[in-house]
Regions:
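Hydrophobic beta-strand positions that form the internal "hydrophobic ladder"
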Residues: 20-22, 61, 104-105, 146, ...
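Conserved strand-to-loop turn within each blade of WD40 beta-propeller repeats
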Residues: 23-26, 64-67, 107-111, 148-151, ...
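WD40/WD-repeat beta-propeller blade N-cap
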Residues: 2-8, 43-49, 85-92, 128-134, ...
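Terminal intrinsically disordered, low-complexity extensions flanking WD-repeat/beta-propeller proteins
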Residues: 173, 203-209, 214-218, 223-228, ...
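WD40-repeat beta-propellers
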Residues: 29-32, 52, 70-74, 114-118, ...
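A structural motif specific to WD40 beta-propellers
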Residues: 38-41, 80-83, 125-126, 165-166, ...
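Loop/turn segments within WD40 beta-propeller blades
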Residues: 12-18, 53-58, 96-102, 138-143, ...
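Solenoidal tandem-repeat scaffolds enriched in leucines and small polar residues
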Residues: 48-131, 135-137
Length: 295
């Protein structure tokens, strides 16, 4: 289950789940300042919340969970009652925004498919059919593709015409998948085998594999620039992996706006002390497929 960051990376939302993440706060969504770790607001719900997403303009917050209700909070008026769309066919597993915040997509915990909702009417306008429940749904940075994970399959859909573009079978049941945002030429997937797999987008060939987690991988996401990606596991750690060769030129690193893999420019200890339950694991080291297999 992913943490959700605003587009500016300034705000972060805490995911809550009654089973394994934050059982004592399973009916809330908390909003933090990602630079300081200060809690800004808490959004109360009546039951477990499983998914959240910022709108593209970061003014709206979308949540969904066991109540089968999609809620839209206005972050400029956080204490105001949210708008509700309450006709989801089952408990909500994932949510995302599409088409410049005019469309919402969601999936359910025990029903296959991804449903697309018109924000103005609150009605379903399209369904992307899958055999298994969709555990992960991501809209690509350029808005062209919707990436979904269901069962042991990763699928890519046209985000405008909603046709299936590519479908690849994975080596295990996968919980999450993410498309590289800059070039769109590779994607990552993680699941029950505790590994983070790297694949060629055009062929589906596995080109890399990362070991290090000691529990199933529940979420994977690329950084906005694609130079690294993060994985969150049931083992309680978040690991950050480098996509390509390390850049040893410190000046280039500073100009790129990205620090070394697995390290944070701000005082991580201070931020994580304030944000209960957030842990950064030891620096992840990426390996080629053949090297990982021999390990």
């Amino acid at each position: 289950m992913p943490w959700s960051f605003s587009a500016s990376r300034r705000f972060v939302l805490q995911p809550n789940h009654a089973g394994w993440v934050f059982p004592h706060q399973c009916q809330q969504r908390k909003l933090w300042d990602a630079l300081t770790g200060d809690e800004l607001h808490s959004f109360e719900h009546k039951h477990i919340v499983r998914a959240c997403a910022f709108s593209e303009d970061t003014n709206l917050l979308l949540t969904g969970g066991v109540e089968k209700i999609l809620r839209i909070f206005d972050l400029n008026r956080p204490d105001a009652p949210p708008r509700e769309v309450d006709n989801s066919p089952s408990s909500i597993r994932t949510v995302a925004w599409l088409h410049s915040d005019q469309t919402i997509l969601s999936s359910c915990t025990d029903i296959g498919g991804v449903r697309l909702w018109d924000v103005r009417s609150g009605k379903i306008v399209q369904t992307l059919e899958t055999k298994s429940p969709v555990t992960s749904a991501e809209v690509s940075q350029d808005g062209r593709y919707i990436t979904t994970a269901d069962g042991s399959t990763v699928k890519f859909w046209d985000a405008n015409h909603f046709g299936l573009v590519k479908s690849y079978n994975m080596p295990c049941n996968v919980e999450s998948a993410s498309l590289e945002p800059k070039f769109g030429n590779k994607f990552i997937a993680g699941g029950e085998d505790m590994w983070v797999h790297l694949f060629d987008f055009h062929t589906g060939e596995e080109i890399g594999c990362n070991k290090g987690h000691h529990g199933p991988v529940h979420c994977v996401r690329f950084s906005p620039g694609g130079e690294s990606y993060a994985s969150g596991s049931e083992d309680g750690t978040v690991r950050i992996w480098q996509t390509g060769p390390a850049n040893n030129d410190e000046n280039d690193t500073q100009n790129s706006g990205n620090g070394p893999t697995g390290k944070v420019k701000v005082a991580a200890d201070e931020v994580t002390r304030k944000i209960e339950g957030f842990h950064i694991g030891k620096e992840g080291k990426s390996g080629e497929k053949d090297k990982a297999a021999d390990a």
